[in-house]
């Protein structure tokens, strides 16, 4: 498959075969995620982060450098010319003359799509508001493939927390629809998965459960995908306080789950997963975070036309 110069904006843009192709390349690159290679020697990737990020920004930075490339960019809007009034469009037009690819995180939904329509080099969406986060989804699927005893198509996946504002769960739901996985959505009423996504999944013929009770789904879940409540997306702090701390996984919570059930989280966590869970056999969120490096190495090498 040819991904050279292709933009990575949304999981909706990919077929199952294309996703599997990316994950297969990630598996081949995983050994190099610690020791490195030189296939991107001389290449420059711009990482433009208008919102705070730890894992995504640093794992992209690591991925580029493990491939032998270098990075330029900024880690907040405050350190860019945005503070002087420069538009995103103008920034993209400038940066695409400096770099061979652009990794963009922006608070505005649709920003990455707009950037891709302007840029002369591949744009990789590292999160656009409450929209999409495709490389997070790819590493989530890679984690399920590596850590679960079942194939992705046979999994029961419980997605828990902020399903309204959480872009990671939007992207993940679309991707899991390609595999026919069974999905359970657990959230407070005011943070339910958007109706447009539910309707999309139903048209795909997926088995979907919506509930506000975590206990309803724990017994049958192969994957418990926890998310934090997206405080920064709430227009009213009082509304956030009403739902903060709604769901929390503890060792006691996990007493009734299957022996092979895994707990995932895109991180950062607040209080959704007790620290004591880290030592249990179910915890996979730190390994999940590491998998971001080989997956992003795979994405970068593909869009930049590097043969591995």
Swiss-Prot record:
<dbReference type="GO" id="GO:0004070">
    <property type="term" value="F:aspartate carbamoyltransferase activity"/>
</dbReference>
<comment type="subunit">
    <text>Heterooligomer of catalytic and regulatory chains.</text>
</comment>
<dbReference type="InterPro" id="IPR006132">
    <property type="entry name" value="Asp/Orn_carbamoyltranf_P-bd"/>
</dbReference>
<dbReference type="InterPro" id="IPR006130">
    <property type="entry name" value="Asp/Orn_carbamoylTrfase"/>
</dbReference>
<dbReference type="InterPro" id="IPR006131">
    <property type="entry name" value="Asp_carbamoyltransf_Asp/Orn-bd"/>
</dbReference>
<feature type="binding site">
    <location>
        <position position="55"/>
    </location>
    <ligand>
        <name>carbamoyl phosphate</name>
    </ligand>
</feature>
<dbReference type="InterPro" id="IPR036901">
    <property type="entry name" value="Asp/Orn_carbamoylTrfase_sf"/>
</dbReference>
<protein>
    <recommendedName>
        <fullName>Aspartate carbamoyltransferase catalytic subunit</fullName>
        <ecNumber>2.1.3.2</ecNumber>
    </recommendedName>
</protein>
<keyword id="KW-0808">Transferase</keyword>
<feature type="binding site">
    <location>
        <position position="105"/>
    </location>
    <ligand>
        <name>carbamoyl phosphate</name>
    </ligand>
</feature>
<dbReference type="GO" id="GO:0016597">
    <property type="term" value="F:amino acid binding"/>
</dbReference>
<dbReference type="Pfam" id="PF00185">
    <property type="entry name" value="OTCace"/>
</dbReference>
<feature type="binding site">
    <location>
        <position position="228"/>
    </location>
    <ligand>
        <name>L-aspartate</name>
    </ligand>
</feature>
<feature type="binding site">
    <location>
        <position position="84"/>
    </location>
    <ligand>
        <name>L-aspartate</name>
    </ligand>
</feature>
<feature type="binding site">
    <location>
        <position position="167"/>
    </location>
    <ligand>
        <name>L-aspartate</name>
    </ligand>
</feature>
<comment type="similarity">
    <text>Belongs to the aspartate/ornithine carbamoyltransferase superfamily. ATCase family.</text>
</comment>
<feature type="binding site">
    <location>
        <position position="133"/>
    </location>
    <ligand>
        <name>carbamoyl phosphate</name>
    </ligand>
</feature>
<dbReference type="Pfam" id="PF02729">
    <property type="entry name" value="OTCace_N"/>
</dbReference>
<feature type="binding site">
    <location>
        <position position="267"/>
    </location>
    <ligand>
        <name>carbamoyl phosphate</name>
    </ligand>
</feature>
<keyword id="KW-0665">Pyrimidine biosynthesis</keyword>
<feature type="binding site">
    <location>
        <position position="136"/>
    </location>
    <ligand>
        <name>carbamoyl phosphate</name>
    </ligand>
</feature>
<dbReference type="InterPro" id="IPR002082">
    <property type="entry name" value="Asp_carbamoyltransf"/>
</dbReference>
<feature type="binding site">
    <location>
        <position position="268"/>
    </location>
    <ligand>
        <name>carbamoyl phosphate</name>
    </ligand>
</feature>
<comment type="function">
    <text>Catalyzes the condensation of carbamoyl phosphate and aspartate to form carbamoyl aspartate and inorganic phosphate, the committed step in the de novo pyrimidine nucleotide biosynthesis pathway.</text>
</comment>
<comment type="pathway">
    <text>Pyrimidine metabolism; UMP biosynthesis via de novo pathway; (S)-dihydroorotate from bicarbonate: step 2/3.</text>
</comment>
<feature type="binding site">
    <location>
        <position position="56"/>
    </location>
    <ligand>
        <name>carbamoyl phosphate</name>
    </ligand>
</feature>
<dbReference type="GO" id="GO:0006207">
    <property type="term" value="P:'de novo' pyrimidine nucleobase biosynthetic process"/>
</dbReference>
<dbReference type="GO" id="GO:0005829">
    <property type="term" value="C:cytosol"/>
</dbReference>
<dbReference type="GO" id="GO:0006520">
    <property type="term" value="P:amino acid metabolic process"/>
</dbReference>
<dbReference type="GO" id="GO:0044205">
    <property type="term" value="P:'de novo' UMP biosynthetic process"/>
</dbReference>
